[in-house]
Amino acid sequence: MTDPIADYLTRLRNAIKAKHRVVEVPASNLKKEITKILFDKGYILNFKFVEDGPQGTIKIALKYDLVNKVNAIKKLERVSTPGLRKYTGYKEMPRVLNGLGIAVLSTSKGVMTDKEARDLKIGGEVLCYVY
């Protein structure tokens, strides 16, 4: 697999379109950090790391509106790819949907949202947009 983050986002996207309640994805440290951000920002209901085998998996409970059956995540968009890395400074940091969405960045201080990176005045690699 050449791009594990794109695979992670695609598995989430497919589970949302199929209206699944839980999705399992292969685990890595970067995927765990992205999942924690999605949980903290309220895009997913819950997650659990399951150690089975050398890699382990992450079980993610997706969040749906009970009345309208609409998911909390409208779009997951991969920005930086292995073939074309996208880096940004804190001054040029993208605002996703004018601040309604989040950009997930990999910085020297770890994986964080665009707002956290802007507050710390550090740039990094833009991994994905979530809204």
Curated annotation (Swiss-Prot):
GO terms for cellular component: ribonucleoprotein complex; ribosome. Keywords: Ribonucleoprotein, Ribosomal protein, RNA-binding, rRNA-binding. One of its GO terms (molecular function) is structural constituent of ribosome. It comes from the Bacteria. Disulfide bonds: none annotated. One of the primary rRNA binding proteins, it binds directly to 16S rRNA central domain where it helps coordinate assembly of the platform of the 30S subunit. This is Small ribosomal subunit protein uS8.
